[in-house]
Amino acid sequence: MFTINAEVRNEQGKGASRRLRTAGKFPAIVYGGSEAALSVTLDHDSTMNLSEKDGFYTDVLTLSVDGKEIKVKIQAVQRHPYKPKITHIDFVRA
């Protein structure tokens, strides 16, 4: 099972997302179920390392957000056109 550490994201928009990516992080969103959508920030390098392992895209993952664990599956991954970078991930609650 995969565990990803995440932080709640307060700033929204293109400028905030660009600042995150420059700092080695990227935005993601968790939606689905009865709870409201949750915007989070993930560390790029640790997520890229996990994404290279078998089962990352198909298994149920655990997002650790402020000490709370959320079971999620990956819905969509957006990547940079030519750099080996993830720019955004959509998670759906499992």
From Swiss-Prot:
Q: Does the keyword Chloroplast apply?
A: no
Keyword annotations:
Ribonucleoprotein, Ribosomal protein, RNA-binding, rRNA-binding
CDD domains linked to this entry:
Ribosomal_L25_TL5_CTC
| InterPro entries, A to Z | Rbsml_bL25/Gln-tRNA_synth_N, Ribosomal_bL25/Gln-tRNA_synth, Ribosomal_bL25_short, Ribosomal_L25_dom, Ribosomal_uL5_bac-type
The organism sits in which domain of life? Answer: Bacteria
Q: What Gene3D superfamilies does UniProt report for this protein, alphabetically? A: Ribosomal Protein L25, Chain P
GO cellular-component term (any): cytosolic large ribosomal subunit
Which SUPFAM superfamilies does its entry note? Ribosomal protein L25-like
Q: Which residues form the signal peptide?
A: none
Q: Which Pfam families match?
A: Ribosomal_L25p
Q: Which GO terms describe its molecular function?
A: 5S rRNA binding; structural constituent of ribosome
| Gene Ontology biological process | translation
Please verify whether the record's keywords include Lipid biosynthesis. Answer: no
What is its quaternary makeup?
Part of the 50S ribosomal subunit; part of the 5S rRNA/L5/L18/L25 subcomplex. Contacts the 5S rRNA. Binds to the 5S rRNA independently of L5 and L18.
Function text:
This is one of the proteins that binds to the 5S RNA in the ribosome where it forms part of the central protuberance.
Q: What does the similarity note say?
A: Belongs to the bacterial ribosomal protein bL25 family.
Q: Name it.
A: Large ribosomal subunit protein bL25
Q: Which gene encodes it?
A: rplY
